[in-house]
Design a protein with these regions (language model features):
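Juxtamembrane intracellular "pre-TM" segments in multi-pass secondary transporters
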Residues: 1-2, 187-222, 426-434
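Short amphipathic helix-loop junctions that connect adjacent transmembrane helices
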Residues: 25-43, 237-262, 350
């Protein structure tokens, strides 16, 4: 990867760090809001504020995707850090819940502006190389995961040390992201932007999304990716809450005995490392494996993960080999599941090759699918956990993975029609790869 792509990855890490840091610190801030002169915050209010972020990302990603095609991916990716910095400064200044809701909308706008433009830039920069596209997709997902993880881990310590002032420090990190994008990333899309300008009317035409969404490949990819995101998202929303306290309603489930914060944190670190290794491994297999093959492997890996989780959750009283085997199966399944995310991202980038003047609009669908998946996963996870606890989450995960399989066969049959890197030369390779 060249210097600009590495800078994009570095900026993605710092930007996602700031996003994760804000979200986690806000949860602590709201819990202690009366100490800072604000009202007592109910759990439902916290949930509403959490959903507001994803709603903003869902609605605004198409807007900024189209805008990045008109103004340039490099220019629009600069908007995100600015929105984020304003949002965190306002967050530290107020205890008013309405204003805090507005800051979550602004924070969602930050992500909505950044992600489609970043991914549009990556799609353009990797248009000539299967290997480079695989590496870039995996590293983008890795930078996203690492940024979120470090932000979540640092949030309690920073807020304990600085209080609401920590939000202002986060604005500095947003400033670092802006500087990385401004001076570290070269504007590669001047020529493509000029073509786009002559191809469209002078106004920003969101009706372009209608034509793009009529592409069958998008509709085949959408349910698969949304379902995979939902299967992962339900654990993001429920796992810490479920693991952190004993639940007498499910005495037969080992994972409901209640775990300490240290145990949960160490497990999260191990999960993050395994997922990150999986991202790098499968991201380097784009040249030899079809995108849909890697997605299929990922879904199968998710099924193995579920089976391992069941063995762990019901391993009490059974031979020691059963829970140990469950741990190994879950670890292997997670490693394989990780490949589905860069493969789906790479496939979306391939689809963008058919619409070279609409890369930002196409890649904006990444945020749309992610937001829908997170919202759906959160809702399903809540009902599943109430119904059967960890077993309910495992069953919901398995069901969502089955949903992801349904359109995959048809998508696989049409995959060779999707333009990818070195399109004319490589379509045959794509068809014949395993």
């Amino acid at each position: 990867m060249d210097r600009s792509l590495w800078a994009v990855m570095g900026g993605t890490f710092t930007l996602r760090f700031s996003t994760g840091l804000t979200g986690a610190m806000l949860a602590v801030y709201l819990a202690k809001l009366p100490e800072h002169g604000g009202p007592v915050v109910a759990a439902t209010t916290l949930a509403l504020l959490h959903a507001t972020f994803y709603l903003s990302e869902l609605v605004l990603s198409p807007v900024f995707g189209v805008l990045s095609d008109r103004l340039g991916h490099h220019r629009v990716m600069l908007f995100g850090p600015v929105f984020g910095a304003v949002a965190v400064i306002l967050t530290g200044l107020t205890t008013n819940l309405t204003i805090l809701g507005g800051t979550r909308l602004l924070e969602g706008a930050s992500t909505a502006a950044s992600v489609p433009s970043i991914l549009g830039y990556i799609a353009l920069a990797t248009a000539t190389s299967e290997v480079l596209r695989g590496k870039a997709a995996a590293r983008f997902e890795g930078a996203t995961l690492a940024g979120f993880g470090v932000g979540f881990a640092a949030a309690p310590l920073l807020f304990a040390a600085f209080g609401p002032v920590a939000f202002y420090l986060n604005a500095v990190v947003y400033g670092v992201s802006f500087l990385i994008y401004r001076f570290g990333v070269e504007d590669h899309d001047r020529e493509e932007r000029a073509v786009a300008a002559t191809a469209r009317a002078s106004r920003m035409d969101l009706s372009r999304y209608g034509a793009l969404l009529r592409t069958s490949h998008v509709w085949l990819l959408a349910p698969t990716w949304i379902a995979v995101n939902a299967s992962i998202g339900l654990w993001f929303s429920q796992s810490i809450f479920q693991f952190s306290q004993a639940n007498p309603n499910f005495p037969d489930q080992v994972l409901h005995r209640g775990f300490s914060a240290v145990e949960i944190s160490l497990t999260a670190v191990v999960v993050g490392i395994l997922f990150g290794i999986g991202l790098l491994y499968w991201g380097n297999r784009f040249k030899n494996l079809r995108r849909t093959t890697i997605i299929l492997y990922g879904i199968i890996g998710g099924g193995i993960l579920v089976a391992g989780g069941v063995a762990i959750n019901h391993g009490a009283g059974l031979p020691f080999a059963v829970p140990v085997g469950g741990v190994l199966a879950a670890a292997f399944g997670l490693f394989v599941l990780a490949g589905a995310t860069p493969a789906a991202l790479g496939l979306l980038a391939d689809i963008s090759e058919r619409f070279p003047t609409d890369r930002g609009a196409i890649m904006g669908l990444y945020s749309v699918f992610l937001a829908v998946g997170q919202i759906v996963g959160s809702l399903i996870g809540g009902f599943a956990a109430e119904w059967r606890g960890i077993d309910g989450l495992l069953l919901a995960t398995f069901a969502l993975l089955l949903v992801a399989l349904v359109p995959l066969a048809q998508l696989r049959r049409q995959e060779h029609y999707v333009g990818g890197p070195s399109q004319a030369a490589s379509l045959g390779d794509v068809e014949t790869a395993p």
